[in-house]
Amino acid sequence: MTCIAPLDIQGFTKLAPWWRTEIPTEIVLSGDGIGELFSMIAKRGAKAFFVIDSALQDQTSFARVFDQKEKFIFNATESEPRTGDVDALVEEIRASHADRNLLVGIGGGAAMDLTKATGICIANPLRAQD
């Protein structure tokens, strides 16, 4: 499949509704954000997959997240997430964690960007590189 990107904003607006997506987002900032997060997951009956910033590994308040089996630890010190990172994570989730119905990003901007891009690509048939 060949994809030709429009050269200007007017070209992008003609792509609608293809160029529209919604990402349900909830941001939790609190003294017990991790506890609240796990409570919300339990209330929803969700099966979460976590994308976690490796910089949080030594912080005890995040230990419960790092103890989860269903996780991917992203090292943002090496680079910002690339399309190849997104595609690899999508394939890992589809192959080994297909029962997960909630994607949770924890950490800084790179981990959050990777989580959002992965969520979009899981819901769509094309790769991020496409």
Task: For each feature predicted by the language model, list its residue ranges.
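Glycine/threonine-rich beta-strand-loop-alpha-helix active-site module
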Residues: 84-130
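ATP/NTP phosphate-donor binding region
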Residues: 1-102
